[in-house]
Amino acid sequence: MVELCDGVLLPCLTHGKKSEVACGDIVEIQRISDAQGVIERTLPRQTLLYRSDAYRQKLIAANITQIIVVVASKPSFSDELLARCLIAAHDQKLATLIVLNKCDLLEAAMIARAQLEPYRAIGYRVLELCAKENASPLRPFLQGHTSILVGQSGMGKSTLINALLPDAQAPTREISTALNSGKHTTTHARLYHLDTESHLIDCPGVQAFGLHHLNFGAIEAGFVEFAAFHGQCRFHNCHHTHEPGCALKKTEQEGKIDARRLKLFQEISQNRC
């Protein structure tokens, strides 16, 4: 579906099975009827967020300026998925915001807040709210950005969209109590206009975020707190696992970097998919 300059939505085909278009792409089309067009060209992208494994890649959104990772007090969220999203954002030089939703669940919120403390400590912005009650604290962070909401299913992304844009009518569903997980309610990425300068993309919930397209250095750079110790290891090609003279392991033992973050780095760098 392509939005034309006048705001009309036009169903469009792509040329060939390998033609990949992402939500947020700016394209040139050719009308083939009053009700359909063909995408002829995708204009150069300023940014591209995507995930990948050894066999394929999945485009998520193009030309975004900010990633908003939505986590919740309940169901519990994955530290690794959060870290992977932030690595991908750092690679594309995107502004980042972590939203902790469902803060009305007080006991669960305390646990989630502690889980996010290492991210606050290294400078990530964390916004706490309850989308069902009041999503307005998020609005100032959206101004002037093309933002994308990402996160696991059940975190409340669609509820946020509906609170910010009541006419959007994004589908929502209760989480599975037995599985402590959400079900996919958004089936494809969709772009919404907040105003002429601010736009918001909602994408399907993700359970995995492969980073096969990023090399070791890009993943290391995505752990922003490691930058202060770059080049201090005994070996220039240190992978910060078992090597003697590793500055990061020494720093972690001294309590200067969070042990959980170092462990996450080791796991992600050894298994980028």
What are the functions of these language-model segments?
Residues 1-4, 12, 29:
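SH3/SH3-like beta-barrel fold
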Residues 7-23:
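Beta-strand/loop nucleic-acid-binding surfaces
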Residues 19-33, 43-67, 94-96, 103, ...:
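Helix-rich effector regions associated with P-loop NTPase G domains
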Residues 22, 38, 62-64, 80-94:
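Switch/coupling subdomain of P-loop NTPase systems
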Residues 70-78:
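Short, glycine-rich nucleotide/cofactor-binding loops
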Residues 95, 105-155:
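Canonical P-loop GTPase G-domain recognition
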